[in-house]
C-alpha cells in the first residue's frame, strides 16, 4: 500500500517475463527516459544518458519484481540493459542531428477518418530542426522493414473484388516494365501518419525503432516513400492505404468480407481467431456471427 501497487503489479515470485511483459517494461522505460531528455542539452554524454536510463530500468524492474528476483529475470534484465545502452547512444546521436521528441505514448481518442471514430496510441513522435516529422513505433524484437511488414505481393489481384469491388491493389512497375501488385496486410503506420498529417500538418514519415536482443540490429528503419508516387503508380502508398482503411472498416461494420485468405490467393494467416470456435464452413461462421453476406461474395 505504501508503494501504491496492486498485487498484479508487484510479482516478487515470478520466474521470468513473457515477451509482451518485457516489451511493456521497455516501453515504460523509454517513455520515462524520453520525457526527461526530449532535446539536446549542454553536457549530455553517452555515459550520462546510459547511466540515467539504467537507473530508470532499475527502479521500474525493482518496483515490479522486488530486490531479489530469480535468475531468469536477472538475465532478462541484463538483456534490457544492453538494448537500452545502445538506445541511449543512438538517442544522443539523433538529438545532435537535430531531432527532438515532441510526443510520447500519444493517446489518440475519437479521431474521425471518414465516417469512423478511431482511437489508438503512438509510441513516439519526433520533429527535426528543419520542421519534418516522423512517427515511430517501437519493436522489441527483430522485425522486417516498414514496407515489407505492411505490404504483401498478390498472386491473384483479380480475386480482390471477391473481398470488395472497392479495393484495388497497390501496383508498382519495375524497371523491366513488369507490374507488381501489392495488398495491404498491415495498416498501422499509415494510420498513424494520416492522423499526424491532420494534427501537425506537413508530410510526416513513419519508422520502426527495433530493439531486438542482438545489439547490432538495434536502430531506426524509416519509411520515407509513403507520400511519393512510385514509377508506374497512379497514387502514393499513403492514399492507397487510406482507401483500404476506409473500405475494410466498412466491411467490418456491414458484416461483409467473410472470405478466406486461400480464396484470395493470400498467404494463410499465422493465427485464426475463429478456428477454435467453428468449423471451416461459411454457413456455420455466418450463423455464429449473425451476419448477412452480400451477393458479390462467392458463398
Which functions belong to the PLM regions below?
Residues 1-299:
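RecB-family 4Fe-4S metal-dependent nuclease core
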Amino acid at each position: 500500500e505504501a508503494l501504491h501497487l496492486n498485487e498484479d503489479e508487484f510479482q516478487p515470485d515470478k520466474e521470468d517475463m513473457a515477451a509482451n511483459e518485457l516489451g511493456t517494461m521497455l516501453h515504460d522505460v523509454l517513455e520515462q527516459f524520453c520525457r526527461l531528455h526530449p532535446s539536446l542539452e549542454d553536457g549530455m554524454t553517452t555515459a550520462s544518458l546510459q547511466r540515467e536510463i539504467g537507473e530508470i530500468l532499475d527502479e521500474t524492474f525493482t518496483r515490479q519484481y522486488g530486490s531479489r528476483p530469480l535468475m531468469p529475470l536477472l538475465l532478462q534484465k541484463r538483456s534490457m540493459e544492453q538494448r537500452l545502452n545502445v538506445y541511449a547512444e543512438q538517442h544522443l546521436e539523433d538529438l545532435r542531428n537535430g531531432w527532438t521528441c515532441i510526443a510520447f505514448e500519444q493517446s489518440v481518442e475519437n479521431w474521425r477518418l471518414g465516417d469512423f471514430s478511431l482511437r489508438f496510441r503512438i509510441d513516439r513522435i519526433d520533429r527535426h530542426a528543419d520542421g519534418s516529422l516522423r512517427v515511430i513505433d517501437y519493436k522489441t524484437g527483430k522485425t522486417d522493414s516498414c514496407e515489407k511488414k505492411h505490404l504483401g505481393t498478390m498472386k491473384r489481384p483479380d480475386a480482390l473484388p471477391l473481398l470488395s469491388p472497392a479495393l484495388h491493389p497497390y501496383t508498382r512497375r519495375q524497371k523491366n516494365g513488369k507490374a507488381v501488385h501489392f495488398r495491404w496486410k498491415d495498416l498501422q503506420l499509415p494510420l498513424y501518419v494520416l492522423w499526424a498529417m491532420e494534427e501537425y500538418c506537413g508530410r510526416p514519415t513513419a519508422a520502426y525503432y527495433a530493439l531486438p536482443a542482438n545489439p547490432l540490429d538495434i536502430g531506426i528503419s524509416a519509411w520515407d516513400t509513403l507520400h511519393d508516387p512510385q514509377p508506374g503508380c497512379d497514387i502514393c502508398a499513403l492514399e492507397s492505404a487510406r482507401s483500404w482503411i476506409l473500405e475494410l472498416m466498412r466491411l467490418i461494420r456491414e458484416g461483409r468480407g467473410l472470405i478466406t485468405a486461400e480464396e484470395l490467393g493470400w498467404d494463410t494467416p499465422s493465427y485464426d481467431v475463429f478456428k477454435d470456435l467453428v468449423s471451416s464452413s461459411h454457413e456455420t461462421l455466418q450463423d455464429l456471427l449473425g451476419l448477412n453476406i452480400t451477393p458479390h461474395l462467392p458463398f
